[in-house]
Amino acid sequence: MLAQFDVNLVVLLVLLICGLLSQNAAVTIAADVLIVIKITPLNQFFPYIQAHGLNLGILILTIGVLTPIASGKLSGESILKSFISFKSLVAIAIGLLVAWLGGRGVKLMSSQPDVVAGLLIGTVAGVALLRGVPVGPLIAAGLLSLFIGK
């Protein structure tokens, strides 16, 4: 009986419950999709998802961030003004820092997958307890890389 106990499935179920309790659609849907893939023949796609999922997610996120520029909601004038306002210049600097941290986070999560569970637990807890949003794992991993020197 113990040989058939799947700890990874239990972790996904716990994440699903946390997502539901915290009303976090992203965590809920992600856990749901991964559970379905795991318990069906679709599990043959896990190597592809592991190899390309993070990059695909970053691509979709980038499209979402750039959409206001493409749609015209963020005007060219507003973009140009961002280079002369102190507040906007600070925002640009922080954006650069966060992007750099995210890059470090991707590298750390790829090279040291043992930290992923802790980062996910912290992110889900932050969403559930602090009403945060689930953009934390990459930035958290980037910050962690500064502390552990990777």
Swiss-Prot record:
Database matches in InterPro entries: UPF0756_TM
Membrane topology, as annotated: Multi-pass membrane protein
Main location: membrane
GO annotation, cellular component aspect: plasma membrane
Highest rank taxon of the organism: Bacteria
Keywords carried by this UniProt record: Cell membrane, Membrane, Transmembrane, Transmembrane helix
UniProt keyword Transmembrane present: yes
A Pfam family reported for this protein in Swiss-Prot or TrEMBL: DUF441
TM ranges: 1-21, 45-65, 83-103, 115-135
Disulfide-linked positions: none
Location of the protein in the cell: Cell membrane
UniProt family annotation: Belongs to the UPF0756 family.
HAMAP family membership: UPF0756
Annotated protein name in UniProt: UPF0756 membrane protein ABAYE1440
